[in-house]
Amino acid sequence: MRRFNLRSLRFGSDSEAWRSLPVETAPFVFGGVEYVVPGGVVELELDAARVDDQLTLKAHLETEIEGPCQRCLGDARVPVEASGIDYVRHGDSEGAEFDDDEDEAPEGYARGFVLDVERWVRDLIGEALPLQIVCREDCAGLCPTCGADLNEDPGHTHEE
């Protein structure tokens, strides 16, 4: 799912609605290296509250990112949890269409009643990524001289 029609939300008597949305997620390039969400799909939990002419949208996701460790190049799998809020006023960008070729991202993630869930998920994950993706916190990395994995041979040395 790339986009979600907000009109499909069914609000209860408390003017709130909830949906779980499967969102396809493209690979991320981080530090010149590609990282993926296992299975390529993230479950986005979407809560919506309606007050007068405004919708408050709250998004939450929990997933993992996998790819090479940035220290030893072994396999790394990092948990990612992220939340965000967006607001939609009735009439804002009413009838406006998304332009996938826009140079600048629009403010917010909704145009009229269409929510760009793919872009919101990408932004949430990107903002929640750690500064360095590692296989484990104490990863020793690679030998700067020969490239040996120092996790496999912690006593690794070179004759001088």
What is the predicted role of each segment?
Residues 1-160:
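Structured interface patches
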